[in-house]
Amino acid sequence: IRMLSLNTPLPARHRAQLIASDVSVMRGATPVLNHVDLTITATSRVAIVGENGRGKSTLLHVLAGTLTPDSGVVQRLGTLGIAEQEMPTGDDRTVGQAVAEAIAQPLAALASLDAAAASLSAGVTGAEERYAAALEHAEVLDAWDAERRVQIALEALDAETDPARRLHDLSVGQRYRVRLACLLGADDDFLLLDEPTNHLDRSGLEFLTTQLRSRNGGVVVVTHDRALLSDVAETIVDLDPTPDDQARVYGNGYAGYREGRRAERERWEHEYERQQTELGRLQDSLSSAQNRLVSGW
């Protein structure tokens, strides 16, 4: 187990922020994301929706820092975990290794605390300060409970619990559930999920919903699942096409999203009718002018 460096990033908890400012991403000459602004805090529950190919996963990767936007800035204070929709097939790790890597920081914090306690008992100079710092790190990470959190999630998601099983021997769904359980146990400041319900049964979805609603950290989820949208999302980012090519951000949960979409469509229909009326008026004026030219009046 590696020792925890005092420079290792720690969760920011209530101070955590993830801010995307004027973010744009191009695919060739085609804009995928167009000047997106989004602020996520430790209490945010955000869902990203839209048709296939509209940039939902792209936005998730931009927020995670794994994709650099063509323009705009993403700033983050705090730790982050992401579960992608696609899972690698050649992963030779065991379930136990995946769990250990996911909670490496809490495990290292406990090892550092044990070492600091031994130094304190031996009367080593400066041991009190090192012990106090190690204890603070362990408390911030809730390190004593990390392994239990993962085990609870593995069982609740019906994931593989045998630590000796190789990930490449598991199905795609099983690998995803192991990854998801590890992330839930790691307890990062921000949890980013791409279509998590694809590999969950009803009981797994209920467990995930409870976890996302109660966790002490921000959530961003790409999903088409209406139950998850209704039960978890408080803010919904809609990447579907709009007249001005701008993403729409709706508050007040799924109900607010549906009402916002309805109002947006009514505005669009009203504007379309106004334009058609104006077009008809211009055509009538043009016809009248042409008739006067022909008749000489």
Task: Show the residue positions of the predicted features.
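ABC ATP-binding cassette signature C-motif
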Residues: 1-270
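Intracellular alpha-helical coupling/juxtamembrane segments of multi-pass membrane proteins
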Residues: 261-289, 293
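Extended alpha-helical coiled-coil "stalk/arm" regions
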Residues: 296-297
